[in-house]
């Protein structure tokens, strides 16, 4: 096939201007379970689907991460790459605090992770990051939500979905999202979007959520009981 010589080397563009290895990495994201971020008038809510095996013991979410006291993240794709990016982001955030004596901005974290992804698109001997990250939080600029992908792109959103069947969730969010949505209604909206994208239509064991409220600027995991309330309200809509 004509593309064969171009999809083996990450540093070589095809004649039609494509980097096949980067495109394959983006396909990896599409195979991951769905993750969603929503900006509300009083905070940010981030959630992810985490399917668990019957005998699996999991005390902490595997696809939700705390980067700083005011910054959270969710991942879709190759999760070990996400852990590597989060570790780097945590170190970057702490270094920023030491150097500038202020909390890092949400966009600065998103740009840093996007820059890291971009580096892995231009050097031979390394593969692209196989993960997309939703970065959200509250800083002096307000409530902010960003998406990074394996190409090194980062974009700000009001609401975003990534992972398997994210097109269904995105279409739903496009239709139902409102600028003045409350944090609680955002939780209900996100739960409804996850049910649309997931093949699991009952229960909430597969849904994990976190939030950063505007008034506290503190990352916190949402309890299973509260997630169940969101899910119940979502099914009544």
Report each predicted region and the residues it spans.
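Long, low-complexity N-terminal extensions
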Residues: 1-237
């Amino acid at each position: 096939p004509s593309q064969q010589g171009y999809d083996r080397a990450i540093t070589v563009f095809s004649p039609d201007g494509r980097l096949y290895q980067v495109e394959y990495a983006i396909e990896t994201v599409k195979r991951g379970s769905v993750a969603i971020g929503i900006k509300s008038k009083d905070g940010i809510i981030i959630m992810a689907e985490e399917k668990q095996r019957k005998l699996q013991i999991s005390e902490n979410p595997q696809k939700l991460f705390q980067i700083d006291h005011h910054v959270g993240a969710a991942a879709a794709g190759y999760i070990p790459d996400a852990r590597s990016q989060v570790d780097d982001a945590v170190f970057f955030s702490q270094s920023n605090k030491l150097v500038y004596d202020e909390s890092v901005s949400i966009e600065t974290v998103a740009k840093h992770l996007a820059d890291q992804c971009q580096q892995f698109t231009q050097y031979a001997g390394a593969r692209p990051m196989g993960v997309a990250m939703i970065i959200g939080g509250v800083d002096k600029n307000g409530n902010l939500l960003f998406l990074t992908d394996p190409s090194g792109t980062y974009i700000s959103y009001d609401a975003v979905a990534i992972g398997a069947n994210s097109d269904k969730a995105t279409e739903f969010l496009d239709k139902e999202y409102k600028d003045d949505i409350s944090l609680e209604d955002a939780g209900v909206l996100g739960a409804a979007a996850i049910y649309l994208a997931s093949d699991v239509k009952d229960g909430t064991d597969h849904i994990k959520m976190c939030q950063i409220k505007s008034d506290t600027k503190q990352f916190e995991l949402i309890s299973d009981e509260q997630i169940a309330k969101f899910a119940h309200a979502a099914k009544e809509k």
